[in-house]
Amino acid sequence: MRAQPVISYEYPLNERIRTLLRLEDLYAKIAHFLGGDAPQDHHVALLTLFEVLEVAGRADLKVDLVQELERQRQILISFRHNPEISEQALSGALYEIEQASSSLLAMAGKIGQYLRENEWLMAIRSRASIPGGVCQFDLPSYHYWLNRDPEQRRGDLEGWLRPMIPIREGLTIVLRLLRASAQPERQLARGGTYQLTMGGRGAQMLQLRLAPAEAVVPEISANKYAINIRFMLSETVVRPRLAERDIPFEITFCSL
């Protein structure tokens, strides 16, 4: 029997996880557009790289990732010689964490500083902040670059991205562990609303799963004390309205 389709929504409960989710989304977009050959694909990939530079530079991200990876490494080490856990799988996970940590520690200086020191790239970044600011008459050298062979452009983009790959690898491991940290619970939002007192739950992220056929979108407000979810009718023309009916959904309280 085929699994029923679901839409997953994730809501971070602290700034650190919020930053990791944003970066994960940006790295995925870069990978998508980097795979294309059209000048527009590589234009979007470059602008998205500038977004990664902006988001990653707001916090001491490298230190946070290294510390979290080390904490997870110690937890995994404590599972050694547990007959219920595969030693091979455990060794593989430890190796992956250790490699990611080593790559992060090898990153020198401020994240993305090499990009900030590239005057040509920073000129593009500056013009890109202006609506319609990267037309060929604004940046003829960029227009020339966009008309180069796709493989040459892709090589340049990969070179600019490569030093920031350790960030992507580190956050991928952390978010994977976070998502696998708990099991979903089935709940019912009566009259389209769901409220819960956290009661000491140390959740760092909420994950909601809904059937697309419900045609609703969750509006989530949460802190360490309580969560409030309102399921709104999916509207693209008028202001969303509360779905005044019972909505079945799954919720996962993810925490490392």
Swiss-Prot record:
Lineage top rank: taxon: Bacteria
InterPro entries reported in the protein's UniProt record: ZapD, ZapD_C, ZapD_sf
Role of this protein: Cell division factor that enhances FtsZ-ring assembly. Directly interacts with FtsZ and promotes bundling of FtsZ protofilaments, with a reduction in FtsZ GTPase activity.
Subunit architecture: Interacts with FtsZ.
HAMAP family given in the database record: ZapD
GO cellular component terms listed in the entry, alphabetical order: cell division site; cytoplasm
Coiled coil: none
Keywords: Cell cycle, Cell division, Cytoplasm, Septation
Subcellular location: Cytoplasm
Name assigned to this protein: Cell division protein ZapD
Entry keyword Cell cycle: yes
Transmembrane region(s): none
Record-stated family: Belongs to the ZapD family.
GO terms (BP aspect): division septum assembly; FtsZ-dependent cytokinesis
Pfam families named in the record: ZapD
